[in-house]
Structures are given as C-alpha cells and as structure tokens.
Amino acid sequence: MFSPARPTMVLGSSQPAEAVDHAACERAGVDIVRRRSGGGAVLVIPDEMIWVDVVIPRRDPHWDDDVGRAMHWIGEAWRQAIDPRALRVHDGRLVTQALAAQVCFAGRGPGEVILESSPTTKVVGISQRRTAGWARFQTMVHRRWQPVLMADLLTERPDERQLADAVGVVERPEPDLLAALVRHLTAPPT
C-alpha cells in the first residue's frame, strides 16, 4: 500500500506533458510526475485515495499469460471487498472516450471495477506492468473525488459533470476495506 506525501498529478505513459496546466498545478501545490503505465492522468491526494500494488511471480496460481484477463482476479478481489452486489468487474476490452485520454478513471479496462447501476462510473482503477517473471498490478480506489480540482489542473478543461460521474467513491473505513481485500487476494483461485 502506498500513501502519497503530497498532492500529485500522475500523467499516463502516453500522455503529453502539455495536457496538464503546470502553472495551475504549481498554484494548487500539486506536483507533476509520469508513470510507466496507463493513459490519462490520475490525481493522487493524501488521505483521499487508497493505492495498493500487488506483485505476483509467474508461478502464482493467479498468473494469466493473457494481459487483459490477468487483471480480472484482482478486480474481483476488490469487488468482493467493497460491495459485490453493487459492483461488477469489466470483462470486455478497453473502453475509451475523449475524456479518458485526459483522465484515467473516465475509461474502463479489463478487470476494472465499475458500478452495476452506472457502467461509466469506475470504482477501482487497475494498471499492470509485467516481465516474463512477474506482474505488478497497480490499483487505486477514491475515498474522496474532487472533479472541479481535476478540471482546474488540466489544460483543456473537461466537463465537470462528466468528471463527477466518472469516479465512484468508496466510503467503507480503510482498515476494514484493506482487511477484506487481503482476505480476497489471498484466497485460492476458483
């Protein structure tokens, strides 16, 4: 589990640096960094999200050579930990829209967790890095979402309502949520 020390705008691997308003980030006290995975930006703010990375070796029973299918088990663990009745794991291909090029949570990828009642609302974002010997799954859940701040920090200001609807917030107490997640992550594959 990671806890950011400062508010940070994390650019996706293919996102141009110009997508973010650097002056607005500086005024807001938001650092800018780039990750090696994903498409759109992610706004990471201390105490407003839960960021959990899981690394498995190739010999792990959860390993799948199919990169898309490989994320389903971790999405299912998050779904079970949060609320299995209200959520589902996206089992299709990557679904993007114009907003997803700017904001990671506006798209849906294989294994990501979305609201059953609103399939455009992402609750758990997942990205993956892998080598021949291991896979690292980077996951994030929002405990609070600030769509206006996110819009303010982007060069091309997106519609705030679309941003607000793109992200589902998890209000379950963090210790309980993490304990449930660990239980589901360590359960044998079915």
Please give the residue ranges for each predicted region:
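Short acidic-glycine loop/turn motifs at beta-strand connectors
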Residues: P46, L115-P119, T131-A132
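Extracellular structured ligand-interaction cores
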Residues: R6-T8, P110, Q138
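Short, structured patches in soluble enzyme cores that scaffold and shape functional sites
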Residues: S13-Q15, V54-R58, W78, S127, ...
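N-terminal lobe of the biotin/lipoate ligase/transferase fold
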Residues: M1-G68
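A translation/RNA-centric and nucleic-acid-associated enzymatic feature enriched
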Residues: V124
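Internal, conserved structured core segments that host functional sites
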Residues: D47-P110, S118
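Long, positively charged amphipathic alpha-helical accessory segments at protein N-termini or as interdomain linkers
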Residues: G75-V103, Q128-T190
